[in-house]
Structures are given as C-alpha cells and as structure tokens.
Amino acid sequence: GPTNLAVSDNFKKRFESYGWEYVLINGHNKKEIFNALKKVQKAKKPTIISCKTKIGYGSPNKSGKSSSHGSPLGLDEIKLVRRNLNWNYKPFVIPKKILKEWRKIGKKGELLESKWNKIFKKKKNRINKILKNNFTKVLKKQKQISIKEINNLATRKSSELTLNALIKQNNTLIGGSADLAGSNNTKTKHHKITKPGDFNSNYIHYGVREHAMCGIMNGLSLHSNFIPYGGTFLIFSDYCKPSIRLAAMMKQRVIYVFTHDSIGLGEDGPTHQPIEQLTSLRSIPNLNVFRP
C-alpha cells in the first residue's frame, strides 16, 4: 500500500534538524542526479540526496503500486516495460556504450584502491612495529597486577585498569560507551573525548544508541587500522546484534565490553537481567566470547 500507511515523517526537516544539507531531486532524471552528486562533493557538512522516484517506473500496469515490489512483474509486463522504456536489447545484454563506461569507472576505482592499500600497508607496518616494541612488556606487567589483586577487584574495574595500560601505549584503540561509561569502566584517564570539530581523540560518547555505536565501530575498523571497543550492559547486546553479526562475518577487529552479565542484578530489576544473551552471542560464527 501507500507509504502513508506507516510513515508521516517530514524527512527534509528531520535531516535539517541534524545539521545536514538536504538536496531534493527527481530520481529518474540523470542530469539532476549528476548535478546533485557534483554539488555534494563540495559540501562542508553531511549531505543527503533525496531522490523522488515512482515505484515500478516504466511499468504500464504496476507503476505506483506496491505489487511491483513484492511480486514479479511477469513476462508479459516485462515486455511492456521494455517497449515503454525503449529498451531494445535482449535479456542480460549490456549495451557496448554502457559497458565501456563501466570499464572506465572500474579502472579508476582499481587505481584508487591500489593507492589506498599501499598507504594502509605502510601505516599498518609502522603501527605493528610500535606495538611489538611496547605491548609485550605492558601486558605482562598488567597481568601480574590483575592476578595479584584479583580477589579485591570487580571484573569491570580490572578491565578498566588493563585498558588504562593499553591506551597509554596504543593510539589505535578507540574507546566508547552507549551512555554507560561510568558503569562499564571503558573510559580511562588517558582518553581524550571526541567533540564536534575535534577528532584528535580516542573516546566517543555514543549516547543511548547501542546499534549506532556498533555500526560506527564497524566503520572505524573497516576504514583504517583502528581497533574500536564499546561498552554497554550485556542485556543490551540485543540492540547491537545486527552490527555484531556483520563484524563477525567480515572478520573485523571490533571489541564489545558487555558488563553487568548476571541475573543477580538488583535495583534495575528483570529488564536488565541477561538470560539468553550469552547463548545467543556464542552461537555467532567468528565471534570470540570470553566471560572471565
């Protein structure tokens, strides 16, 4: 059915309230698409291009109907769409002109990827060299401290002390928490908080946005040699699950600090008592789960 069955948002106002640039175009007009993409490349803030399109465009009998999305058009309707769009090529045939342009873009992308990989490898080698020189000593010392004081420390406090030692030696670790830094103990005295206009930092306050936090951590891991970690209560790992699953599929170095993992949690009550979460996390392929 129509989108107004479920949505009444004013998307323009929503994104403008975020401080974004909003560009509205006809999504079926290639000139408008080209001009919009050209414009946003010069933008000084995040931009969303809103492409106004019609579902099932070109289909004489299903254009503008939800049925064009949920079910096949059918062979007869496909023939009519081809005629309507003046598309005179056989199925799976790519016109030479289009193929030529695709190949050009492919070569351009290949060159950019090659340059990026060289820079990435250079930085990775430099960082690995730094880690090898310092990390073994730091970890050994911290292990001895943790073992010595284990009876007097909560696990999350022991985690904080370990992070405190690691952050001091490793500028690739990017910490954060979904509005629970004080409870998760993910923030140390060596952290500098990320603020608008100041990204020379290594700690992000994500707010009550567990899913966004884990999605951002995936991006940090994929883009550079960062090792992001983020904290929340184990019960809220369910909000993180889609992004955790993607990180595991992509074999990314993303670390999740899930505290308060006991059904013995008192004042917060049953809504904060994890029961099935640990089993669920352990069932995800490529995800290593450690429960000290």
Language-model features: where?
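Thiamine diphosphate
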Residues: 24, 100, 104-292
